[in-house]
Amino acid sequence: MFLKKLKLTNFKCLSNIELSFEKTKTENRKWTLILGENGTGKSNILKSIALVTSGSNALGELLGNTDSWIKFNEKSCSIQAELETKKGEERNISLQFNRGDNLSKIISNNRESLHLIDDAIENADRNYFVVAYGASRRLSNEVFSNFEKSRNGRSINVRNLFDSASTLNPLTAWIIELDYRSGKEGINLVKEALKDFLPGITFHSIDKEKKQVLFETVDGIIPLDQLSDGYQNMAAWIGDLLFRITETFKDYKKPLEARGLLLIDEVDLHLHPKWQRRLLDFIGTKLLNFQVVATTHSPLTAQQADSGELFALKRSDNNIVELVPFQGSPKSLLVNQLLMTPVFGLETDESYEVQQAKEEYEALKSKGDSLSSSDKEKMKEVKRKLKTKLPKRKAPSSSDKEIALLQKIETKLNIKK
């Protein structure tokens, strides 16, 4: 299944949002990144996708208070989506919630769309496979506590997006279970999945007696639970995701090549900038046939998006949230250039203190001859501050290696001419 189009009407704070996931008329986009200030509804877009693809049983477990999904002062809300099956067939599905409706009324009113999902799931539970993660991605303290509980229920695959208190299946549990079930073949899958998993560490082995997964680091062989918080946060959802894929597609020789939809809120949470720059490539390489819809606040992550993959939620002058596509390719911009595009909305790449000092100076300067003596003293003070605080910009320079590479490319181009 691939998601082709999404339309939201009065869903939470989103009055009227339309988003196409088509790269071309014949090809769907693999990546969609959504930016936006807090409170503009980034997470709500992910939740709407999870709800409309959930099916009857899961919907009842995820929905909670029906009225909470409807925009304030509105009587109803709707989610409309267009999907494409593995066979290339189009499916139009939708959900509508009316204020005051209970769960049975909602299921009755949306019977036709839910029937499409339910039939597909009944045929094979892995049809329309969707996994979702919220911004709070916590590991269980007990290695196998949630591991056994999570074997049933389609809603479990997206629960973390809706419930910040929900915990994930530990990476340790997945690896030990896979080793027990599949032996050497399982360990090879682990090695392949975790290759380039995190910078500076590699999977080493399993300590079966202590029920620990060991990683090789610059500081020696260290168990997963002793790695940094950033590594463990990444391990939390990556481990849970790998578990769900291999459990669902356990009859596949290469389960990581299965098709599916991954929804993840704040995809780069707690990650060092070096790893943020590699994250999209890692996910795309490991999950070749997954479609990914993610939110981010990071310009480093946004910079990895290709043309047509980056969008921003912005509030208009009349406080309506609008979806703004990024014009051009983020990959072609420097990070500071990207920060000052409309999708991020920064006016300068200088510090807030310097920006304030400049504005104060311009305000004083605009007074012209009407400057008071105290204004003149203030102006001198602001000038001194700017002189010491204003960053010095250097002309961009290239290293000897970069110059040599450019010369080599130029030589090859001349030969081709």
What are the residue ranges of the model-derived segments?
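Extended helical coiled-coil dimerization/tether regions that scaffold
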Residues: K86, R154-E257
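Conserved H-loop
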Residues: T296-H297
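Conserved P-loop NTP-binding catalytic core
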Residues: L46-S104
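Phosphate-binding glycine-rich loops of NTP-binding sites
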Residues: E27-D67, D229-F243
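RecA-like P-loop NTPase motor core
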Residues: F2, G284-T285, L300-K417
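Walker B catalytic acidic pair
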Residues: D265-E266
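Pre-Walker A-like glycine/lysine-rich segment at the N-terminus of P-loop NTPase domains
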Residues: M1-A50, G284
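Coupling/switch segment of ABC-type P-loop NTPase heads
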Residues: L95-L198, P342-V343, Q356-E362
